[in-house]
Amino acid sequence: VLVRQPDTSRPASLPSGPLEPRHRTLEAGLRTWVEEQTGYDLGYVEQLYSFGDANRHASARAQPGRMLSIGYLALVHESKPRRMEASEWRSWYDFFPWEDWRDGEPEILSSVRDGIAGWIAEAPRDERKSREERSRVAFGLPGSPWNEELVLERYELLYEIGLVPEAHRDGAACWAPREAAIMDADSLQADHRRILAT
């Protein structure tokens, strides 16, 4: 995954920018922003997902209106870009270590499941069964297999519980305290990790 981090005191971000009048289409805007920010010319581009939820992150709550984010998958040639300052290639698993089953079940999954178990245990009686089912399906808890296609659902569940730092940064109402957030995974600015999960 190509990320940008011009300011090392802040989390990295995906290449991005607003649609502007100079962009004839959404794809033209995407190509312009990626080339300007990373030096790469994009090859094949496919739109994957659109996010338009109200109040998705702190900066969206501070401004009137709604922010629309569109996630793309784009391919680039392996050659060196014209410039790459503040950009680097990172493993997708840096952002989702609980998804890395290449060497068997990831160690981090036990602490994730402990956090989820606490969230379920403290649920009001009428919500407990729903939380159990959602967690069982998303995280392959006893009685359910691990489904590698549920990356977004797992991330959104961890966000809702408060087990990822972005939930606390965004001021989301969540069950887990800030100290319980999983710090063994790298976060991204705004809702970029959610977009990456698609």
Each language-model region and where it sits:
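A generic structural signal for short, non-catalytic loop/turn and secondary-structure boundary residues
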Residues: 7, 40, 65-67, 86-89
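Active-site-adjacent beta-strand/loop module that shapes the phosphate/pyrophosphate-binding cleft
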Residues: 34, 55-83, 150
